[in-house]
Design a protein with these regions (language model features):
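Ser/Thr-centric signal marking residues that sit
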Residues: 58-60, 65-66, 86, 102, ...
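Short, basic phosphate-binding NTP loop
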Residues: 1-58, 65-82
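Glycine-rich nucleotide phosphate-binding loop and flanking beta-alpha elements
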Residues: 20-22, 63, 131, 153
Protein backbone atom coordinates (compact mmCIF):
# COMPACT_ATOMS: atom_id res chain seq x y z
CA UNK A 1 0.00 0.00 0.00
CA UNK A 2 1.05 3.57 -0.62
CA UNK A 3 1.57 4.55 3.04
CA UNK A 4 3.83 1.56 3.72
CA UNK A 5 5.85 2.33 0.58
CA UNK A 6 6.23 5.97 1.66
CA UNK A 7 7.44 4.91 5.13
CA UNK A 8 9.94 2.47 3.60
CA UNK A 9 11.27 5.32 1.44
CA UNK A 10 11.84 7.49 4.51
CA UNK A 11 8.65 9.49 4.97
CA UNK A 12 8.49 11.08 8.42
CA UNK A 13 5.02 12.60 8.14
CA UNK A 14 1.93 10.86 6.81
CA UNK A 15 -1.21 12.81 5.97
CA UNK A 16 -4.21 10.61 5.31
CA UNK A 17 -7.98 10.51 5.23
CA UNK A 18 -7.80 7.14 7.00
CA UNK A 19 -6.83 6.76 10.62
CA UNK A 20 -3.64 4.80 11.23
CA UNK A 21 -4.32 1.81 13.44
CA UNK A 22 -0.92 1.50 15.12
CA UNK A 23 1.50 4.15 16.32
CA UNK A 24 5.01 4.09 14.96
CA UNK A 25 8.18 5.59 16.39
CA UNK A 26 9.64 8.60 14.54
CA UNK A 27 6.51 9.00 12.43
CA UNK A 28 4.04 11.86 12.62
CA UNK A 29 0.56 10.98 11.45
CA UNK A 30 -1.90 13.73 10.51
CA UNK A 31 -5.53 13.00 9.84
CA UNK A 32 -7.52 15.16 7.42
CA UNK A 33 -11.05 14.65 6.19
CA UNK A 34 -9.96 16.14 2.83
CA UNK A 35 -6.27 15.68 1.98
CA UNK A 36 -6.57 17.40 -1.41
CA UNK A 37 -8.06 20.52 0.17
CA UNK A 38 -5.34 20.52 2.85
CA UNK A 39 -2.62 20.19 0.18
CA UNK A 40 -4.02 23.10 -1.85
CA UNK A 41 -4.44 25.39 1.15
CA UNK A 42 -1.01 24.50 2.56
CA UNK A 43 0.65 25.08 -0.83
CA UNK A 44 -0.91 28.53 -1.04
CA UNK A 45 0.31 29.38 2.47
CA UNK A 46 3.88 28.26 1.82
CA UNK A 47 4.15 29.98 -1.57
CA UNK A 48 1.81 32.78 -0.61
CA UNK A 49 3.18 35.61 -2.75
CA UNK A 50 1.24 35.84 -5.97
CA UNK A 51 0.05 38.45 -8.47
CA UNK A 52 -2.38 41.11 -7.17
CA UNK A 53 -5.43 40.19 -9.23
CA UNK A 54 -6.67 36.66 -9.91
CA UNK A 55 -9.50 35.90 -12.33
CA UNK A 56 -11.07 32.44 -12.76
CA UNK A 57 -13.07 31.35 -15.81
CA UNK A 58 -15.27 28.26 -15.58
CA UNK A 59 -18.03 26.68 -17.64
CA UNK A 60 -18.52 23.83 -20.07
CA UNK A 61 -17.50 25.79 -23.16
CA UNK A 62 -15.58 28.98 -23.81
CA UNK A 63 -13.05 28.92 -20.96
CA UNK A 64 -9.99 29.01 -23.22
CA UNK A 65 -11.42 31.67 -25.54
CA UNK A 66 -12.51 34.01 -22.74
CA UNK A 67 -9.24 33.50 -20.87
CA UNK A 68 -7.27 34.35 -24.01
CA UNK A 69 -9.47 37.34 -24.92
CA UNK A 70 -9.14 38.72 -21.38
CA UNK A 71 -5.35 38.18 -21.55
CA UNK A 72 -5.10 39.97 -24.90
CA UNK A 73 -7.24 42.93 -23.77
CA UNK A 74 -5.12 43.47 -20.66
CA UNK A 75 -1.88 43.03 -22.61
CA UNK A 76 -3.02 45.58 -25.24
CA UNK A 77 -3.66 47.98 -22.35
CA UNK A 78 -0.06 47.57 -21.15
CA UNK A 79 -0.96 45.48 -18.11
CA UNK A 80 1.49 42.92 -16.75
CA UNK A 81 -0.65 39.85 -17.32
CA UNK A 82 -0.45 36.06 -17.54
CA UNK A 83 -2.93 33.36 -18.46
CA UNK A 84 -3.07 29.75 -17.30
CA UNK A 85 -5.16 27.01 -18.88
CA UNK A 86 -5.64 24.65 -21.79
CA UNK A 87 -3.46 26.77 -24.08
CA UNK A 88 -0.70 26.73 -21.48
CA UNK A 89 1.01 29.36 -19.38
CA UNK A 90 1.37 32.67 -21.23
CA UNK A 91 3.07 35.82 -20.02
CA UNK A 92 5.20 38.48 -21.68
CA UNK A 93 6.51 36.64 -24.76
CA UNK A 94 6.62 33.23 -23.11
CA UNK A 95 4.31 30.31 -23.80
CA UNK A 96 4.72 27.07 -21.83
CA UNK A 97 2.68 23.91 -22.31
CA UNK A 98 0.90 22.60 -19.20
CA UNK A 99 -0.27 19.04 -18.52
CA UNK A 100 -3.74 20.02 -17.27
CA UNK A 101 -6.19 22.86 -17.76
CA UNK A 102 -6.07 23.41 -13.99
CA UNK A 103 -2.70 22.35 -12.59
CA UNK A 104 -2.19 20.49 -9.33
CA UNK A 105 -2.15 22.84 -6.33
CA UNK A 106 1.57 22.57 -5.56
CA UNK A 107 2.58 23.37 -9.14
CA UNK A 108 -0.06 26.10 -9.40
CA UNK A 109 1.28 27.74 -6.22
CA UNK A 110 4.78 27.56 -7.69
CA UNK A 111 3.62 29.12 -10.99
CA UNK A 112 1.81 31.97 -9.23
CA UNK A 113 4.82 32.64 -7.02
CA UNK A 114 7.12 32.72 -10.07
CA UNK A 115 4.75 35.11 -11.87
CA UNK A 116 4.79 37.38 -8.80
CA UNK A 117 8.63 37.37 -8.93
CA UNK A 118 8.40 38.42 -12.59
CA UNK A 119 6.18 41.39 -11.56
CA UNK A 120 3.02 40.00 -13.20
CA UNK A 121 -0.01 41.82 -11.73
CA UNK A 122 -2.99 40.02 -13.32
CA UNK A 123 -3.55 36.29 -13.84
CA UNK A 124 -6.51 34.93 -15.75
CA UNK A 125 -6.92 31.18 -15.35
CA UNK A 126 -9.25 28.46 -16.46
CA UNK A 127 -10.98 26.66 -13.61
CA UNK A 128 -11.96 23.23 -14.93
CA UNK A 129 -14.72 21.25 -13.24
CA UNK A 130 -12.21 18.48 -12.48
CA UNK A 131 -9.80 20.98 -10.93
CA UNK A 132 -12.54 22.57 -8.85
CA UNK A 133 -13.93 19.21 -7.74
CA UNK A 134 -10.43 18.01 -6.80
CA UNK A 135 -9.78 21.15 -4.71
CA UNK A 136 -6.86 22.29 -6.89
CA UNK A 137 -7.82 25.96 -6.51
CA UNK A 138 -8.59 25.89 -2.79
CA UNK A 139 -6.69 28.50 -0.83
CA UNK A 140 -6.80 31.02 -3.68
CA UNK A 141 -8.94 34.13 -3.43
CA UNK A 142 -10.23 35.30 -6.80
CA UNK A 143 -11.08 38.92 -7.51
CA UNK A 144 -13.33 37.96 -10.42
CA UNK A 145 -15.12 34.74 -11.31
CA UNK A 146 -16.58 34.20 -14.77
CA UNK A 147 -19.13 31.44 -15.41
CA UNK A 148 -19.65 30.86 -19.14
CA UNK A 149 -22.32 28.16 -19.39
CA UNK A 150 -23.28 24.66 -18.32
CA UNK A 151 -24.21 21.87 -20.70
CA UNK A 152 -24.22 18.06 -20.66
CA UNK A 153 -20.52 17.22 -20.61
CA UNK A 154 -18.06 15.48 -18.28
CA UNK A 155 -20.87 13.30 -16.92
CA UNK A 156 -18.51 10.32 -17.07
CA UNK A 157 -16.66 12.01 -14.20
CA UNK A 158 -19.42 13.93 -12.38
CA UNK A 159 -22.15 11.27 -12.90
CA UNK A 160 -25.02 13.79 -13.09
CA UNK A 161 -25.75 17.46 -13.82
CA UNK A 162 -26.23 18.34 -10.15
CA UNK A 163 -22.71 17.16 -9.26
CA UNK A 164 -21.33 18.89 -12.35
CA UNK A 165 -23.05 22.16 -11.44
CA UNK A 166 -21.90 21.92 -7.82
CA UNK A 167 -18.29 21.46 -8.91
CA UNK A 168 -18.52 24.76 -10.79
Amino acid sequence: NYIEDAIKKGAKIIVSEKKLLKKRPNLVFLFSSNVRKLLAETSQKILYKKPKKLVAVTGTNGKSSITDFYYQILKLNSKKVASIGTIGLKYKDKNKTLDNTTSNPVYLSFILNELWKKKIEFVIMEASSHGLDQNRLDGLIFDVGIFTNLSHDHLDYHKNMKNYFNSK
